[in-house]
Curated annotation (Swiss-Prot):
Protein name (Swiss-Prot/TrEMBL): Large ribosomal subunit protein uL22
InterPro entries: Ribosomal_uL22, Ribosomal_uL22_bac/chlpt-type, Ribosomal_uL22_bac/org-type, Ribosomal_uL22_CS, Ribosomal_uL22_sf
Gene source species: Acidovorax ebreus (strain TPSY)
Assembly and binders: Part of the 50S ribosomal subunit.
GO biological process: translation
NCBIfam families the UniProt entry points to: rplV_bact
Gene name per UniProt: rplV
Lineage of the organism: Bacteria, Pseudomonadati, Pseudomonadota, Betaproteobacteria, Burkholderiales
Amino acid sequence: MSETRAVLRGVRLSVDKGRLVADLIRGKKVDQALNILAFTQKKAAVIVKKVLESAIANAEHNDGADIDDLKVKTIFVEQGTTLKRFTARAKGRGNRISKPTCHIYVTVGN
């Protein structure tokens, strides 16, 4: 069977926080990975779980894959654009606030 991908771009999440969760499920079987993500208490876990479920649905619908045989082949989190915002400070000054985004790529296969 070929590999099937799912991509989520522009997620309002830091790359480092996303990679912490991605490292937990890399190389695992999909049912085990979903179980790990369900019990991981991080914002990134909810987002990565949605992308993984999308990749599983893509594999089942597009390739006719059996879910029991699938495992997470690759998962990586790359840096997206950074939203730059302004916050007011004392004496008429201002400081920049950086709001990072990331892109999440998940590939499942046998």
